[in-house]
Regions:
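Non-transmembrane, aqueous-exposed alpha-helical and coiled segments at domain scale
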Residues: 1-8, 14-17, 54-57, 72-80, ...
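Short, Lys/Arg-enriched charge-dense amphipathic segments
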Residues: 48-55, 96-98
Length: 109
């Protein structure tokens, strides 16, 4: 856990610059961010967001809220996915060739 800017792309870049090897990025609305240096695993617990943006999101955690899986089952699947990504499986952003979602000047405080 690091103190980074609130802008999605800038916060991911800050985490990676600080040494993060895999960014686990939680999103409610489905920000399709990625990075060229380290994988960005995007997860949501919003089932509407996952349904709409499943091509851009890597993990659907909404089953914790709506079932039928238990917290333990979801946690086990999440950890298997993290291990698979660490072993080379591409996250959605990498598979889509989506690396950074900022074009032009970004003012970050």
């Amino acid at each position: 856990i690091m103190d980074t800017p609130s802008n999605d792309a800038a916060s991911v870049a800050g985490l990676i610059a600080g040494g993060c090897q895999l960014v686990v990025f939680t999103t409610g609305l489905g920000t399709p961010t990625g990075n060229a240096v380290a994988p960005v695993m995007k997860i949501t617990a919003n089932k509407k967001t996952y349904k709409t943006m499943q091509d851009n999101l890597d993990f659907d955690a909404s089953h914790v809220i709506y079932g039928p899986e238990t917290m333990e089952e979801i946690t086990d699947q999440f950890m298997r996915d993290v291990i698979d990504i660490c072993n080379g499986r591409l996250v959605k952003a990498e598979a889509l060739g989506y690396l950074i979602n900022v074009a032009g000047t970004a003012v970050i405080q």
